Amino acid sequence: MGLSRAPWMGRVGGRGMMALLLAGLLLPGTLAKSIGTFSDPCKDPTRITSPNDPCLTGKGGSSGFSSYSGSSGSGSSISSASGSGGGSSGSSVAQGGSAGSFKPGTGYSQVSYSSGSGSSLQGASSSSQLGGSGSQPGSSGSQPGSSGSHSGSSGSNTGSSSSHSSSSSTFQFSSSSSQVGSGSALPTSDNAYRGILNPSQLGQSSSFSQTSGQRVSSNQRPCSSDIPDSPCSGGPIISHSGPYIPSSHSVSGGQRPVVVVVEQHGSGGPGVVQGLPCSNGGLPGKPCPPITSVDKSYGGYEVVGGSSDSYLVPGMTYSKGKIYPVGYFTKDNPVKGSPGVPSFAAGPPISEGKYFSSNPIIPSQSGASSVIAFQPVGTGGVQLCGGGSTGSKGPCSPFSSRVHSSSSISSSSGSPYHPCGSTSQSPCSPPGTGSFSSSSSSQSSGKIILQPCGSKSSSSGHPCMSVSSLTLTGDPDGSPHPDPSAGAKPCGSGSAGKIPCRSIRDILAQVKPLGPQLADPEVFLPQGELLDSP
């Protein structure tokens, strides 16, 4: 019996030992991956990042970004790609479809938003060093995955090339430079293109092509690394896409600026008791924890204290009946293989000034209504431009490395001062280096005055502004009409009461980035010492 049992036990024991041995070999790797998911601080979706975060700069931690693609509402696609090898990375997000859905995406190389039914956005970014770049084409309503749907080039290529198309329009981008090229396109609902180029790529050129066969190209000037908060110095590229004219950034006289705060609402996410006010947990009656998901099934976002007809503080954008902060979120590393929800965390405090201080406001004219649009310093982004109430279909692109000295503005009859040249499809590229100087563009309501704060060229009664902060409109005679959305007032020695200047950085430094609270209206009142001389 013992002799007959021994072989049986030997067989069983051998199999058992083999199973244990295999388990011992496999489980540590699996456990290590699982544990690494939670022990690696770069993969913690609840962490709060900053522009100098090693997880974003590639100096330690986890430098691998996984792509995310998805669809939202009645037809939009989301795709992103990021480069490796250090430097800055980027992501792109397109928004469209049902009202209330908001899918922000930011990277320290570019920030892009697209709105409008049936639109799609594809982004490609690369690091400032020789990293990889790629793109994910998407079509309206599709949901390309993060594998098998890539196009473009990767690795340490010099001069990458990729093409993207959507159901309603086509954009082609090609770059050739001494470094890795990068770019993205944002086709909008009216087929107007808004391209984003990385100014840190010297000698980069871009080409815009529409389905009608019209093709224009322009060269981008390099920018210096000593420009504060510019993309060359590590700041973000912030641009907008969508129906800027006339449904975005509406401005009408007489109202005080309103700070809008996005408050999170929902029924709770995975592992969270249903009914809590925050999608990712938190105590009832308390502000929500750092936001880690923007998936609408886990709770959306709504505006507290603002509406589409209120003034917008610089850094806020309006889309589909809601107002959202730009640069409010920063994209963290999503865990590879995680569910199809990208990880987002609350960004660094606004007081750092990285997201807002480099956003001069470029007023535009559309019929009788005045609208404003944000155009950051040195982004090379494009704006809708041209005469008439509908604006031009072509890009209006002031490729400058500093504050734009010319505004892309024209009257309904087409102004000779219009950088784009009437309503043509050509991009506008104002001459010079784009240094901040006095300039004006004719329009039906008056002039655009660009003067630095405290400049000796500021005459009595004219607005004085901090460099890279504000642009004000005025009457035909040059008298200013400060734009309250910028928190600006006529200031300087020539103004009544000698009101000091306020910069966007000063204003937004006092706006808390999280929570349902509204900023004290006194934040927007002039403060500080009087400015009598430069």
Curated annotation (Swiss-Prot):
Q: Name one GO molecular function term.
A: protein homodimerization activity
Where is this protein localized, as stated in its record?
A: Secreted
Q: Report the protein name in the record.
A: Corneodesmosin
User: Where is this protein chiefly located?
Assistant: secreted
Compositional bias annotation for Low complexity:
64-82, 107-185, 200-236, 397-415, 431-446
Q: Summarize the protein's role.
A: Important for the epidermal barrier integrity.
* Isomerase in keyword set: no
**InterPro entries reported in the protein's UniProt record:** Corneodesmosin
Q: Name one GO biological process term.
A: skin morphogenesis
Q: State the residue spans of region: Disordered.
A: 38-252, 396-497
Q: Spell out the Polar residues composition-biased ranges.
A: 454-472
Q: Which UniProt keywords apply?
A: Secreted, Signal
A GO CC term attached to the entry: extracellular region
Give the residue range of the signal peptide.
1-32
